[in-house]
Swiss-Prot record:
Glycans are attached at N267, N451, N495. Its cofactor is heme. This is Stellatic acid synthase. It is found in: Membrane. The keyword Glycoprotein applies. Belongs to the cytochrome P450 family.
Length: 522
């Protein structure tokens, strides 16, 4: 009996081997062709590619899997690998088969230029997250310029001043809700609160309808989780839900446009209504494309400013001297609160508050997505949900028509060239003790190179569209929270390790298990 079983097993093994051999025989030519093709690609990239002569690891030049490995399998570590490359190879390096990165603040204004200086295209390596066709992910320079012009009037300094009452009302409600929490003694996830504040503002500006997250018992927890849980947010279900939310707002705006007089249409009562009222080609009015645009506005208008608040409030609460000095400076200008109030430009002129904002933005500028993480986000990999520092990953720009020149190097037209504001903001030669939060570095006479290297909103034709809106929210958020008589916040079981980044995923992440910025209100 046992011999029969062994014979049967042996027969099965032989059948399996024969099947594998037959399959191999069928696909052998294809496998051989693939092997030859792969070798040819590697040889081309290493020896014949226009970037072949640029310094950097040969493995990184040969394949994008090198970047993928450090970002995905090592857990967001390619930033640090790039820093190691710079130490070994110099300020200009090839980090993958197609892309260069330069670490030199004097070169920043060569890469990030105004639209009338030269054409600047977007690096297509960022298209994997599902927002293709939106403003920030528009590759072509001319199309980007056309799309951006539709939004610029709404986000100008003058327009933001016009809608400042909306921001002020939300800031007052923010302070009121925090003060109400003092009666309960509850521990508050301040990131959820600030997500509610920024989310209510951007949604109101875009659609004239506030979701009133700031009034919710859990504030903006769901909104915060959806936006901060990047790449898992881009799993099909989660991302589709967010797009459906954006699509609803676009469809509502379109219906409203049909029901109002044409003379009333070209007004700035909301971003969506204003953009839809412009002379936009029909292809640009496609609901799916506009929904992606809306998703980008909702996300970028909330995530980046919330991260600023998280970092800046943490360091302000941790250092009593900073908090007391800020409160003292706000005493006179906020004395008439809540009836008589300054403008955000007047708040901007307060020296110490201005210094805190600049230092906070040095720490907490917007995030950027790498090409390998863009690809991985579409594969549903899930990471931690908290972001708390500034740009760690480089942003890349393309000069499609003309070569760029860096020292002895000539960079061919069409080459993505990246630079990282994280590297600029943490350069010890420009910012001594760069990992210390020191607003005083921006007071009095300071090194002019600090302004040269301070690029939280980037520069050039693709700089941050919502910069003025961000400033208005930032100044009002800090003013209502740290004014004398305002809500008295105290850190609760939160230390720097809950804030400081150790992983680079889309934006930076703190340690695994971080509980974020938690406070109590007294």
């Amino acid at each position: 009996m046992e011999g029969s079983i062994n014979d049967a097993r042996r027969t099965n093994y032989l059948v399996l081997l024969r099947t594998c051999y037959e399959i191999y025989g069928i696909y052998e030519p294809l496998l051989a062709l693939f092997a030859v093709y792969s070798v040819a690609v590697v040889v081309y990239r290493l020896y014949l590619h226009p970037l072949a002569r640029f310094p950097g690891p040969k493995l990184a030049a040969a394949t994008g899997w090198y970047e993928f490995y450090h970002d995905v399998f090592r857990g967001g570590q390619y930033l640090y690998e790039i820093e190691s490359m710079h130490r070994k190879y110099g300020p200009i390096i090839r980090i993958n088969p197609h892309e260069l990165v330069v670490n030199d603040p004097d070169f920043y204004n060569t890469v990030f230029v105004a639209a009338n200086t030269r054409r600047t295209d977007k690096w297509s390596g960022l298209e994997g997250i599902g927002l293709r066709g939106s403003l920030a992910f528009t590759r072509d320079h001319d199309l980007h310029r056309i799309r951006r012009k539709r939004y610029e009037p709404f986000f100008s300094r003058l327009s933001v001043s016009r809608i400042e009452p909306i921001i002020v009302d939300e800031a007052k409600l923010l302070a009121k809700q925090l003060e109400a929490s003092s009666k309960t003694g509850r521990v508050i996830e301040l990131e959820h609160v600030m997500s509610a504040f920024t989310g209510d503002v951007i949604t109101t500006l875009c659609s004239e309808k506030s979701p009133d997250m700031i009034r919710h018992p859990e504030f903006g927890k769901g909104w915060h989780t959806s936006l901060y849980n990047f790449p898992s947010c881009f799993r099909a279900g989660a991302f589709n839900s967010f797009l459906e939310y954006s699509t609803d707002h676009i469809n509502t705006a379109k219906r409203e446009m049909l029901s109002v007089d044409k003379l009333e249409q070209n007004n700035k009562s909301s971003v969506f209504r204003y953009v839809l009222s412009t002379d936009m080609p029909q292809a640009e009015r496609d609901t799916e494309r506009l929904a992606r645009e809306a998703a980008l506005l909702f996300g970028a208008g909330s995530v980046t400013t919330t991260r600023f608040f998280s970092v800046t409030i943490y360091y302000t609460l941790r250092n009593r001297q900073i908090r007391d000095r800020l409160s003292a400076e706000l005493k006179d200008v906020m004395a008439g609160y809540p009836s008589t109030l300054p403008t955000w430009q007047e708040l901007d002129r307060l020296p110490y508050l201005h210094a805190i904002v600049k230092e906070g933005l040095r720490y907490a500028c917007p995030f950027v997505l790498s090409s390998s993480l863009a690809a991985w986000s579409s594969l549903s990999h899930k990471f931690s949900s908290r972001l708390s520092y500034g740009v760690m990953r480089h942003l890349s720009r393309i000069s499609p028509d003309s070569a760029l020149h860096y020292k002895q190097w000539t960079i061919p037209p069409g080459t993505p060239v990246g630079m990282s504001s994280y590297s600029l903001h943490t350069d010890p030669e420009t910012f001594p003790e760069p990992f210390k939060f020191m607003p005083e570095r921006w007071l009095g006479e300071y090194n002019p190179k600090m302004n040269r290297s301070w690029v939280p909103f980037t520069r050039g034709s693709r700089n941050c569209l919502g910069m003025n809106l961000a400033y208005a929210q930032i100044y009002w958020g800090l003013a209502v929270m740290f004014r004398p008589g305002g809500p008295r916040l105290e850190l609760y079981e939160t230390n720097e390790s809950d804030i400081r980044p150790v992983l680079d995923f889309l934006g930076p992440l703190p340690k695994s298990g971080s509980r974020g910025l938690r406070v109590t209100v007294s």
